[in-house]
Amino acid sequence: SFKEMKEMINLKIQESAEMYLETILVLSQRNPSVRSIDIASELDYTKPSVSVAMKNLRENGYINMDADGYITLTVKGKEIAETMYERHTFLSDWLIRLGVDQTTAVEDACRMEHVISADSFDAIKRHITGIENS
């Protein structure tokens, strides 16, 4: 149905925005000066597609961009980025400990981090942390 298709598109847009925000966070940990070209090379995306995404993120209040093109996360952008990064590192580490090879674990964690609800992620995290601490 059209409604389902619209929801799928919105989910893809949300997933893409989360991916960009997480990438900006990771890049800024390596080097505080992040530009669109850095994001493009990190994700292997074209510069024009990154520019469009940055415009959308800026208009929605997730990033700031100065006159020289340097990008910083806003408070709400950083919150989302940190949530995605925590999910990504936790899920990929967990999958690796379960015996999944690193490449697959990282790819799967990358997909899972965007679709899992906060409730489910927190429950998994509590369960695993509980097992490891007992």
Per-range role (PLM):
Residues E42, I80, R97:
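Residues within the alpha-helical elements of helix-turn-helix
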Residues S16-M19, R35, K76, R87, ...:
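N-terminal positioning helix adjacent to the helix-turn-helix/winged-helix DNA-binding module
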Residues S1-E4, E107-S134:
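C-terminal regulatory/oligomerization modules of transcriptional regulators
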Residues K12-Y45:
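N-terminal helix-turn-helix DNA-binding core of bacterial DNA-binding proteins
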Residues S1-S16:
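N-terminal leader segment of winged-helix/HTH proteins
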